[in-house]
């Protein structure tokens, strides 16, 4: 292996060396029939037409035509790896989940890192939140902790999620990323201020995937063996140390090595530098939740660590690269509704929305039997239920067992110990407007107390450098929001915008919009 090449670059050579003592496999069709000639199609004479009987060609071409599956609507670009979670501290007083059963217990895991808004071919070094999803293969089925690298999010009501993502994606006419769309949405929804401030800070462009923290972000509920429950948040802190990329380095890498994050993770694991994260929880009792100064289920806010300290739980360690990217990373499906006994959902509205949205998009992208795909299969649990058939049913379809319940033939029975924790709710049923639920207090604390002067300066520069491409009226709305956080925050951004706006005229792509018709006025006049 050439000394100048990294393991990712030498993957093909490494594969060959591993098989050096083996004879080459016999080339076959998808049905296993040996292939005599893979380089030439069957024709009538050297210049004649192809024959339909050339099943080697049709088998190859038909499969090629169907290689791609729908891209994830968000988190399309990603890297994956496998490893284990090891318990280092006892939290059984909070949760009966088997994953936390005893100190020293190891549970296999799969992890996928990702950017959010970009397509599958986009650069790893863009300013964007990072997905940090963990699948725990437990004896009680899979637990999917579908987190990000930030403890907060842009919105607190799931009905806004499609519009939020649309604003971050491409303009429906120009098919270009549109700063007007991005900043118009953010400026109209000031609950985004906290996440926007985090995003445009130094941590907005992590140095690969190994040097960033992860967060479950949502509020969850833990239930112990006595049926006692608490609310919790999950944190996983990088043991490699936080490292971020400068704007300049990120821009350079996006051209020189757009797959920088994937390459860095693969090479680290291939050379035995296994990345790890220390796993923590925060705990809040139900009584504390009742007297908390704000909604403890609000995804745009954090729980202060001084009041709700981090409690160590264990370690996440990644020690295996994917054997095949498509099989183990592109097809992996994380679902927040996959929660074994001892871990449950809270009233967090965004979490509640994701409980439906994630399995729904997996059924669209991968098919209704996506849990049969090996990387998604809960292989450490025995799956026994009354679900049958459907496209791509890849197992024994549970044989001749009854497919209805209840029945009198000894088929799977319900497990009372798996009953969810009961809780009583009362209140008015309506659509509650949460747009103005204190959008600035924690952002102000972040700006004043967490960031130093140099970091605040870079934050304002990063925001202004992006906001400058939006229209002036949108700039004004955004600056007004930042000013409400802190006068200096708004004034520094405005000063930078004034400089940008004085240096060059605003460029705009004008489109004709008319309700109920796609025809421009001139086109209609010519009808």
UniProtKB/Swiss-Prot annotation:
Presence of the UniProt keyword Phosphoprotein in the record: yes
Subunit structure: Homotetramer. Interacts (via microbody targeting signal) with PEX5, monomeric form interacts with PEX5, leading to its translocation into peroxisomes.
Keyword flag Heme: yes
Modified residues (Phosphothreonine): 511
Modified residues annotated as N6-succinyllysine in this record: 221, 306, 480
N6-acetyllysine: residues bearing it: 233, 306, 480, 499
One GO cellular component term: cytosol
Family membership: Belongs to the catalase family.
Binding residues for heme: 358
Amino-acid positions noted as binding NADP(+) in the UniProt annotation, renumbered to this chain: 194, 201, 203, 213, 237, 303, 305-306
GO molecular function list: aminoacylase activity; antioxidant activity; catalase activity; enzyme binding; heme binding; identical protein binding; metal ion binding; NADP binding
Active site as annotated: 75, 148
InterPro entries reported in the protein's UniProt record: Catalase, Catalase_3, Catalase_AS, Catalase_clade1/3, Catalase_core, Catalase_haem_BS, Catalase_immune_responsive, Catalase_sf
Effect upon mutating residue 526 to D: Abolished localization to peroxisomes
Keywords: Acetylation, Heme, Hydrogen peroxide, Iron, Metal-binding, Mitogen, NADP, Oxidoreductase, Peroxidase, Peroxisome, Phosphoprotein
Protein's gene: CAT
Function description: Catalyzes the degradation of hydrogen peroxide (H(2)O(2)) generated by peroxisomal oxidases to water and oxygen, thereby protecting cells from the toxic effects of hydrogen peroxide. Promotes growth of cells including T-cells, B-cells, myeloid leukemia cells, melanoma cells, mastocytoma cells and normal and transformed fibroblast cells.
PROSITE patterns reported for this sequence: CATALASE_1, CATALASE_2, CATALASE_3
Native source species: Homo sapiens
Protein name, UniProt field: Catalase
């Amino acid at each position: 292996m050439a000394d100048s090449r990294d393991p990712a670059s030498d993957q093909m050579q490494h594969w060959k060396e591993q098989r050096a003592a083996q004879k080459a496999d016999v080339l076959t069709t998808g049905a296993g029939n040996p292939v005599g000639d893979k380089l030439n199609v069957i024709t009538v004479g050297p210049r004649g037409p192809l024959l339909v009987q050339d099943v080697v060609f049709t088998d190859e071409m038909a499969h090629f035509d169907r290689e791609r599956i729908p891209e994830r609507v968000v988190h399309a670009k990603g890297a994956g790896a496998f490893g284990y979670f090891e318990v280092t501290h006892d939290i059984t007083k909070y949760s009966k989940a088997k994953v936390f059963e005893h100190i020293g217990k190891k549970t296999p895991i799969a992890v996928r890192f990702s950017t959010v808004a970009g397509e599958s071919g986009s650069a790893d070094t863009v300013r964007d939140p990072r997905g940090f999803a963990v699948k725990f293969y437990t004896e009680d089925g899979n637990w999917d902790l579908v987190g990000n690298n930030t403890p907060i999010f842009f919105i607190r009501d799931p009905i806004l999620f499609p519009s939020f993502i649309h604003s971050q994606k491409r303009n429906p006419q120009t098919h270009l990323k549109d700063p007007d769309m991005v900043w118009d949405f953010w400026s109209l929804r000031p609950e985004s201020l906290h996440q926007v401030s985090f995003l445009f800070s130094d941590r907005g462009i992590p140095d690969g995937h190994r040097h960033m923290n992860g967060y479950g972000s949502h509020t969850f509920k833990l239930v112990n063996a006595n049926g006692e429950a608490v609310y919790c948040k999950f944190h996983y802190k990088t043991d490699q140390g936080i490292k971020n990329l400068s704007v300049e380095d990120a821009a350079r890498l996006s051209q020189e090595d757009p797959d920088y994050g994937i390459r860095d993770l693969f090479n680290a694991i291939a050379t035995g530098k296994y990345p790890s994260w220390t796993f923590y929880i925060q705990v809040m009792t139900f009584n504390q939740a009742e007297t908390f100064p704000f909604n403890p289920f609000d995804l745009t806010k954090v729980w202060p660590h001084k009041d709700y300290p981090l409690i160590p739980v264990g370690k996440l360690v990644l020690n295996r690269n994917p054997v095949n990217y498509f099989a183990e990373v592109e097809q992996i499906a994380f679902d927040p509704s996959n929660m074994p006994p001892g871990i449950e959902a809270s009233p967090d509205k965004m979490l509640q929305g994701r409980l439906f949205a994630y399995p729904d998009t997996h059924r669209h992208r991968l098919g209704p039997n996506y849990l049969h795909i090996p990387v998604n299969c809960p292989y450490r649990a025995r799956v026994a239920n009354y679900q049958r058939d459907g496209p791509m049913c890849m197992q024994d379809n549970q044989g001749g067992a009854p497919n209805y319940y209840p029945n009198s033939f000894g088929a799977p029975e319900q497990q009372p110990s798996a009953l969810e924790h009961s809780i009583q709710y009362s209140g008015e049923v309506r659509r509650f407007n949460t747009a103005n639920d204190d959008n600035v207090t924690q952002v102000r604390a972040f700006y004043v107390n967490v960031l130093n002067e140099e970091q605040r300066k870079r934050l304002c520069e990063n925001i202004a450098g992006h906001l400058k491409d939006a229209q002036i009226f949108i700039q004004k709305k955004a600056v007004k929001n930042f000013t409400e956080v802190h006068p200096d925050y708004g004034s520094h951004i405005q000063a930078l915008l004034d400089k940008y706006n004085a240096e060059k005229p605003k460029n705009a792509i004008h489109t004709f919009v008319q309700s109920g018709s796609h025809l421009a006025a001139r086109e209609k006049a010519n009808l």
